[in-house]
């Protein structure tokens, strides 16, 4: 398990765009399971939507991507690199995510070759799928 400080040592994201709170399971270069505790204090709830707050779907996808980035960048040979989002396919949003929900984020890599990766992401709340799809990324050496 990784806490927020350990996550921030691996990926460059920071408030208000760091969208994972902890990593529950990690197999470097293969898979990761993360968690986001969704609170009404999230900045995006000010406008999405004030009378009916739901987490924007694109931010659920970003949280999945950040979880995948932790798995990819945990490999010793990838330390110091950045994982850029390269694409998404077949993303589906099944249920809304509300303040008070605990978002479980699981990413498993299907392929990773020469700095390009592809994987499957599934986000759940209380065991029910809220979002799923394929994620692609490219590793980049920071300048």
UniProtKB/Swiss-Prot annotation:
InterPro entries from the UniProt entry: FabA_FabZ, FabZ, HotDog_dom_sf
Compartments where found: Cytoplasm
Keyword annotations from UniProtKB, A to Z: Cytoplasm, Lipid A biosynthesis, Lipid biosynthesis, Lipid metabolism, Lyase
GO terms of biological process kind: fatty acid biosynthetic process; lipid A biosynthetic process
Membrane-crossing segments per the record: none
Function: Involved in unsaturated fatty acids biosynthesis. Catalyzes the dehydration of short chain beta-hydroxyacyl-ACPs and long chain saturated and unsaturated beta-hydroxyacyl-ACPs.
Full protein name: 3-hydroxyacyl-[acyl-carrier-protein] dehydratase FabZ
Organism: Roseiflexus castenholzii (strain DSM 13941 / HLO8)
């Amino acid at each position: 398990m990784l806490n927020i400080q350990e996550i921030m040592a691996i990926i460059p994201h920071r408030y208000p765009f760091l969208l994972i709170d902890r990593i529950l399971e990690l197999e470097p270069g293969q898979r990761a399971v993360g968690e986001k505790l969704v609170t009404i204090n999230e900045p995006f709830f000010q406008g999405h939507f004030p009378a009916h707050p739901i987490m924007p779907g694109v931010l659920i996808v970003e949280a999945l991507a950040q979880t995948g980035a932790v798995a990819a960048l945990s490999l010793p040979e990838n330390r110091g690199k950045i994982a850029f989002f390269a694409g998404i396919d077949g993303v589906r949003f099944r249920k809304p995510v509300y303040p008070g929900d605990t978002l479980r984020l699981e990413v498993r890599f299907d392929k990773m070759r020469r700095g390009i990766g592809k994987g499957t992401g599934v986000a759940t709340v209380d065991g029910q799928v809220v979002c799923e799809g394929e994620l692609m990324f490219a590793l980049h050496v920071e300048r």
